[in-house]
Amino acid sequence: AEVDGTSIPLSCNGKDMLTELYRTSSSDYPRFYRMDVLSRLAFVAFELLQKAMGEGTLSGCDAMLFNHSSSILSDRKHQGTISVPGEFFPGPATFVYTLPNVMLGEVAIRHDMKGATSLIILPEKDSTLMSQMVYAAMLKSSCPDGMVAGWIDCPDENEFEAEISIYKHNHNNNGRTDT
């Protein structure tokens, strides 16, 4: 794991690494242990960003995340509970995470974010397209503190990527908003 180019030493890999990062960055949110891997990844990424930027930094922000895999891990887990007719026991705790926007709900609640949240599924990570979409959204945003945006993808419990940043409004001399 790395934050702002600084490596964070860890003793675990895969989804266990997320739990280790959670314990070192913030251990006061017991719901973390009920989350799916995608939500844990987003949660830890936002915790590390908040820690780097300062307490309360995220509350006045919108959030726009991108990924390719949507909520495939939870989708597969849920499918496993409904595939066999005689063993049809779907659970709400699994089903809720088949909605990929739930990860944004988890971090928005945690950081008291009052702005808009969006998850956009892309065929692949495309930094240019993502920047264009963030810029367009910020032109219409009413959130004073900008937008948390980036790539959060989790195709497998042991293979995932999170890269997020805060994009700030920059009001230049003619009143136009730049990002």
Task: Give residue ranges: language-model regions.
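Conserved "HGTGT" condensation-loop signature of ketosynthase/thiolase-family condensing enzymes
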Residues: 1-179
